[in-house]
């Protein structure tokens, strides 16, 4: 019973995160529309509220294209893996229903966010384009250099919070 409750809680968490991101995108498009002195997306439904769902339908019905010389499997798996990594980050956040108990939730957060950049490198490598590969390697180098300082700052905060 505990496993089913945890599974339902995890599924509900994923659905709520994805829907909230869709509506935050709608909010961003509305704000950008008002900045440009236009209304933004307002053609679908009442004030454009169903627009994220229409965008999702349009996204799923689009034709899938890929570069001719690319490594097909890793080219499509890397964005999916990146999505799963970004959803795993939400597991260490405290909620009303305790999904998983992490003693080292901060370390789990740092690990998941640091792995996210490698999906960019795999996507660049699998496209068999030199420019995409260089962009992926540049993203990895930047992330590694910033993660060292981020980890040191985070561990310093954790260290001095117990004193």
Curated annotation (Swiss-Prot):
Query: A Pfam family matched by this chain, by name?
Result: NADHdh
Q: Which PROSITE patterns match?
A: COMPLEX1_ND1_1
Matches recorded under InterPro entries: NADH_UbQ_OxRdtase_su1/FPO, NADH_UbQ_OxRdtase_su1_CS
GO biological process annotations for this chain's record?
aerobic respiration
Sequence intervals crossing the membrane: 3-23, 77-97, 104-124, 143-163
**Catalyzed reactions:** a ubiquinone + NADH + 5 H(+)(in) = a ubiquinol + NAD(+) + 4 H(+)(out)
| Known EC number | 7.1.1.2
Claim: Cell wall biogenesis/degradation is one of the keywords in the record: no
Q: Which UniProt keywords apply?
A: Electron transport, Membrane, Mitochondrion, Mitochondrion inner membrane, NAD, Respiratory chain, Translocase, Transmembrane, Transmembrane helix, Transport, Ubiquinone
Give the GO molecular function terms. Answer: NADH dehydrogenase (ubiquinone) activity
Its topology with respect to the membrane?
Answer: Multi-pass membrane protein
Q: What is the name listed in the Swiss-Prot or TrEMBL entry for this protein?
A: NADH-ubiquinone oxidoreductase chain 1
